[in-house]
C-alpha cells in the first residue's frame, strides 16, 4: 500500500529533481543512523513526501543538516543528502509502518518473510514507539480495524478507506500545534486516496484469486470508472485545499508537483493499459 505518493519527474526542473533526491537520501541516511541497515528496506516515497512537507512547514524552527556521503547503494560516488528533525520523525514512522504491516501479513497469511522482517524490526519499532506512542498506537489500531473490515468482506468504502485515512491523519499531525487541522486533513484524505487507489490497482488480481477487495461490488456498476475518478478527484482536491493553507515556501513547487501530478501517475498508467491508449502523463 506504499509507493503512490511520488513526484512527476518529467515535469520537475533539474534543481527540483536534485532537491527531491537529497530529501530521499536524507531520509534513508537517518533511517540507517537510527535503525541500522535493516531499517533501510522501509524507505518509501510516501514518507519522503511527508518528510519534505514537514521540513518545509517547519523550516528554520529546527536545525537542518546536509552533506555528500557514500552509502551501500552509492559506494563509489557520494550523493547529496539533507535532513532536519522531521526527517528523524519520518524515519521512525517508516520503520513502525513496515513493522506493523509485516505483523499484519504474518497474522493474516502466515507469510514467513513478513514474520522474519517484523522480527528484524522488533527493537527499532519499540524505540520508535517510545518516542511516538500516539502515532504507533494509531498504526497498530487502524491496521487491526482494517483486518476486521477485510474479514467481514466490507464494501463500505467510506468506512474502510477512512480507517487508513485516520492512520495517516495521526502521522501527518507531527506536533499537534496550530497546523494540526490542515495536516490531519491532508493525511486523512491522502490516506483514503492511497487505500482506494491500491484497491483499484489490485482489483483484477484480487478477483482472479478470490481475495478481498472493497471495490468488488462497485466495480459491477456500468459507470464504475467514472465513479472512481470522481472519488479520487474529490479526495485530492481536499488535500490540495488544505495544503494551500500552509505557509510552505521551501520546496513548495516540488510539493505541488507531487500533490497535483505525481499522485496521478499510477492511476493514469493503469488506465492507459485498460484502454489501450498511450499514457498522456
Task: Explain the meaning of each model-derived region.
Residues 1-185, 192, 196-233, 241-251, ...:
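Acidic catalytic motifs of isoprenoid enzymes
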Residues 254-260:
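Short, electropositive alpha-helical surface patch
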Amino acid at each position: 500500500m506504499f509507493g503512490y505518493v511520488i513526484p512527476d519527474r518529467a515535469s520537475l526542473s533539474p534543481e527540483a529533481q536534485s532537491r527531491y533526491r537529497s530529501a530521499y537520501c536524507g531520509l534513508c541516511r537517518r533511517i540507517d543512523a537510527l535503525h541500522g541497515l535493516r531499517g533501510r528496506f522501509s524507505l518509501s516515497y510516501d514518507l519522503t513526501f511527508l518528510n519534505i512537507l514537514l521540513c518545509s512547514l517547519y523550516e528554520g524552527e529546527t536545525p537542518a543538516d546536509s552533506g555528500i556521503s557514500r552509502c551501500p547503494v552509492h559506494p563509489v560516488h557520494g550523493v547529496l543528502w539533507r535532513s532536519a528533525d522531521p526527517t528523524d520523525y519520518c524515519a521512525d514512522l517508516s520503520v513502525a509502518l513496515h513493522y506493523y504491516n509485516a505483523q499484519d501479513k504474518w497474522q493474516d497469511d502466515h507469510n514467513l518473510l513478513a514474520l522474519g522482517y517484523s522480527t528484524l524490526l522488533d527493537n527499532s519499532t519499540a524505540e520508535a514507539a517510545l518516542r511516538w506512542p500516539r502515532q504507533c498506537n494509531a498504526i497498530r489500531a487502524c491496521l487491526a480495524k482494517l483486518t476486521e473490515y477485510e474479514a467481514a468482506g466490507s464494501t463500505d468504502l467510506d468506512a474502510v478507506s477512512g480507517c487508513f485515512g485516520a492512520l495517516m491523519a495521526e502521522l501527518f499531525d507531527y506536533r499537534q500545534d496550530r497546523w494540526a487541522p490542515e495536516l490531519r486533513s491532508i493525511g486523512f484524505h491522502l490516506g483514503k486516496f492511497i487505500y482506494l487507489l491500491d484497491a483499484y490497482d489490485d482489483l483484477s488480481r484480487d478477483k482472479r484469486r478470490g481475495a478481498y477487495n472493497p471495490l468488488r461490488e462497485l466495480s459491477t456498476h456500468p459507470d464504475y470508472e467514472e465513479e472512481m475518478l470522481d472519488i479520487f478527484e474529490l479526495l485530492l482536491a481536499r488535500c490540495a485545499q488544505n495544503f494551500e493553507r500552509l505557509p510552505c515556501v521551501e520546496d513548495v513547487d516540488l510539493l505541488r508537483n507531487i500533490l497535483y501530478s505525481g499522485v496521478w501517475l499510477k492511476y493514469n498508467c493503469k488506465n492507459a493499459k485498460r484502454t489501450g491508449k498511450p499514457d498522456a502523463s
